[in-house]
Amino acid sequence: MNNLAAVILAAGKGTRMKSNIVKVMHPLGGLPMVSWPVNTAREAGASNIVLVTGHQSEKVQDFFEGQSDVRFAVQEEQLGTGHAVACALPALLGFSGMVLILCGDVPLISTATLKAMVKQHRSRHAVITVLTADFAQPNGYGRIVKDGDGFIKRIVEEKDATDAERRITEINSGIYCVESDFLTVAIPNLKNDNAQREYYLTDIIKEAANLGLLCQAFPVADPAEVMGINDRAQLAEAGQLLRGRINKALMLDGTTLIDPQTTYIDRGVRIGKDTTIHPNVHISGDTEIGNNCLIEPSVVIKGCKIGNGVTIKAGSVMMDAVIHDDVAIGPMAHLRPGTELKEHVKIGNFVETKKIVMGEGSKASHLTYLGDAAIGTNVNIGCGTITCNYDGVKKHRTVIGDDVFVGSDVQFVAPVTIGRNSLIAAGTTVTRDVPPDSLAIARAPQVNKEGWKLKKK
């Protein structure tokens, strides 16, 4: 639909959030709240998106920097929704077609609903289509007033409504589809003669109806889609609904979630078939997980690429790591950015890694720190091993060749290189390179003083 544009209203501060962060930038499902209607408009076919910002405009614009289909308009003073759209009109100069008007704090609207609304708008040759919902308790919403044929005559804000109008349960969602030619004529005619002294976008409905132009309602199938977010309680409720959508889609696509209500997966995460995820798992960022994986409870994964057949045991934390096929991790392992584990690697409990590549079949089973290291294939890292990578000024690298056996309680004082097929004896502090096929041992000889304990009594 290249004749479809969108205006997203996101200028409000959101005082009820009681936050130093502007409302539309609060995170929801791994993204700022405002990015949800922007993405939905894009998925519905809008190729020209105008984001109207106000409070903390720079922060909002910085997030969308580089998205070529998003332009910005600034509403310096918040004088109502009609004024906000007026601020957006210069960015739509030369555009002719349909304009979707969405709210930055109504993030649950679905692509399917917008597409259906646009389709009906086009097929009935409407000038304005209003997305409406029926609420048993419509307090706080504008009411839809219709004529005898069921078309919209006007929308009345609650503060300006009569008692009879307040009893109407069909409400205005704040989402519209409007013909651009009419919008550019009607917006400059708005007046602020109302209780709020604001320029109401809804007044264009009355003008269109007075001109005999078709203004229709499009009732939303699921009223939750038009839920507005004004405080943190509503933000949490919206997050729960979004998680439900995300998790249901994953399950229908072949992923097993043991308890979807306590599984937290962000939009855009990709998970393969026959992967099982246990409760209290958090997966976010640009994460991709392969087929036939097992993720045990209380695992945190952010921005990782994970292959097939990977097991991640309880309590492990991973960020910006690359995990190849058939790797076992945890429990209670910590994989920091720059970690790459090749096929059949084992990382056990209380092992921390950072900026390492670990070759196929290698293992570090317990209580180890591996940082700034290249580790070959089939290497055994003993319990208590540490790569001493920092000298107080800069980081240094440890290189361990293939088939090396590292005993327990070994320290590698980097920079150091260990040749292939070597053995590092338990308790050794390695300060120099070790040639291939060698034994390295650096510890004080054992001394037994017989009878020493008895003399102390």
Swiss-Prot record:
Question: What is the name attached to this protein's record?
Answer: Bifunctional protein GlmU
| Catalytic residues (UniProt) | 366 (proton acceptor)
Q: Which residues bind UDP-N-acetyl-alpha-D-glucosamine?
A: 9-12, 23, 75, 80-81, 142, 157, 172, 230, 336, 354, 369, 380
GO MF annotation list:
glucosamine-1-phosphate N-acetyltransferase activity; magnesium ion binding; UDP-N-acetylglucosamine diphosphorylase activity
Q: Which Gene3D superfamilies match?
A: Hexapeptide repeat proteins, Spore Coat Polysaccharide Biosynthesis Protein SpsA, Chain A
The record's Gene Ontology biological-process terms are: cell morphogenesis; cell wall organization; lipid A biosynthetic process; peptidoglycan biosynthetic process; regulation of cell shape; UDP-N-acetylglucosamine biosynthetic process
Subcellular location(s): the record lists: Cytoplasm
Question: What catalytic activity does the UniProt entry give for this protein?
Answer: alpha-D-glucosamine 1-phosphate + acetyl-CoA = N-acetyl-alpha-D-glucosamine 1-phosphate + CoA + H(+); N-acetyl-alpha-D-glucosamine 1-phosphate + UTP + H(+) = UDP-N-acetyl-alpha-D-glucosamine + diphosphate
Q: Which domain of life is it from?
A: Bacteria
Instruction: Quote the function comment for this protein.
Output: Catalyzes the last two sequential reactions in the de novo biosynthetic pathway for UDP-N-acetylglucosamine (UDP-GlcNAc). The C-terminal domain catalyzes the transfer of acetyl group from acetyl coenzyme A to glucosamine-1-phosphate (GlcN-1-P) to produce N-acetylglucosamine-1-phosphate (GlcNAc-1-P), which is converted into UDP-GlcNAc by the transfer of uridine 5-monophosphate (from uridine 5-triphosphate), a reaction catalyzed by the N-terminal domain.
* Keyword hit for Methyltransferase: no
Note accompanying the cofactor annotation: Binds 1 Mg(2+) ion per subunit.
EC code: 2.7.7.23, 2.3.1.157
| EC class of the enzyme, as a word | transferase
| GO cellular component: a single term | membrane
Which organism is the protein's source? Answer: Geotalea uraniireducens (strain Rf4) (Geobacter uraniireducens)
Q: Which UniProt keywords apply?
A: Acyltransferase, Cell shape, Cell wall biogenesis/degradation, Cytoplasm, Magnesium, Metal-binding, Multifunctional enzyme, Nucleotidyltransferase, Peptidoglycan synthesis, Repeat, Transferase
- Extract the ranges annotated as region (Linker): 233-253
Cofactor dependency = Mg(2+)
**InterPro entries, sorted:** Bifunctional_GlmU, GlmU-like, GlmU_C_LbH, Hexapep, NTP_transferase_dom, Nucleotide-diphossugar_trans, Trimer_LpxA-like_sf
Annotated CDD domains: GT2_GlmU_N_bac (cd02540), LbH_GlmU_C (cd03353)
Q: Where is this region: N-acetyltransferase?
A: 254-457
- Alphabetized SUPFAM superfamilies for the sequence: Nucleotide-diphospho-sugar transferases, Trimeric LpxA-like enzymes
Instruction: Write out the ranges of the annotated region (Pyrophosphorylase).
Output: 1-232
Family membership: In the N-terminal section; belongs to the N-acetylglucosamine-1-phosphate uridyltransferase family. In the C-terminal section; belongs to the transferase hexapeptide repeat family.
Give a yes or no for keyword Zinc in this entry.
no
Spell out the subunit comment.
Homotrimer.
